[in-house]
C-alpha cells in the first residue's frame, strides 16, 4: 500500500535533504557576488551615527540569504546560526555573542522590503542557482509568511509605504507585508518569492510561485481552488498535468519580525 504524502512526511524529507547543507553553502560562498550586493544595500543600511554600532552588513546579508533560502523566521534563523555548524561557518561567526537577535534580523529584512531589494536580490540568487543546476524541480510547496512592520514604515522616498497593509489572522491584527514563497520539495530551498501587502490572499499568488516544471504542487487550505482559478497553471512545460495536492487543514502562518 502506498503511503500518502502528507505535510509531515514532506517535512521529514526536507530535514534529510538539509544534511548536505555544508556542501551546498560552500557552493553558495563561491558563486554569490557578496561585494556587489553589499554595495547595493549599503546606502539603505544604518550609518551608525547614533547609538550602538550596527552589525556588519555582510553578516546581515548572509543571514538574509539563509533565512530566505530555507524559509526561516527571524528567531529560527538566529538559533540556526548559533546551533548549526554549517550556518555559523557560512556567516563567519564562532560565538553566539556575534549573532544578531531576531528583532535586529527582522529590521534588516524590513529595510530590504521597503527599498524593493528583497525580491531583487532573491531572484538573482535563484537565477544563479538554476544556472548551476543546484535546484531540483519536480515538486513545489507553496506557503506564505507575514513580515510585520511598524505603522510608521516608509519607503525609499521617505513616504508612508502604501504596499504595507493590515490583515486579521485569528484574533490578532498584523500590519506589514506578506512573503509568498514556492519551495522545492526535494531540497527544501525556496525558489520563488513574491512580496505583497499583508492583506493579499494566499491563493492569488500561486502562479507566481511556480517555475513551470513541477509535476506536483502542495499547499495548505489557503490554496484551495488554486487549480480552478482563471490564471491557474494546470500543465507544466512538458505538457503534463500538474497534480495539485492541497491540504484541507489550515497551517499556522509564521510571523517573522516584531519591528
What is each stretch, according to the model?
Residues 38-58:
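An N-terminal domain-cap segment
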Residues 252-259:
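Short, intrinsically disordered, charge-balanced linker/junction segments flanking boundaries
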Residues 1-35, 39-43:
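Charged, often Cys/His-bearing segments associated with DNA-binding zinc-finger transcription factors
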Residues 33, 51-58, 97-101:
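Secondary-structure capping and boundary motifs in well-ordered enzyme cores
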Residues 59-71:
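Alpha-helical support elements that line or immediately flank enzyme active sites
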Residues 54-61, 76, 80-81:
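Alpha-helical scaffolds flanking conserved acidic
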Residues 42-45, 89-94:
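Short amphipathic helix-turn modules centered on a small-residue break
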Residues 2, 8, 75, 79-82, ...:
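Polybasic low-complexity intrinsically disordered regions
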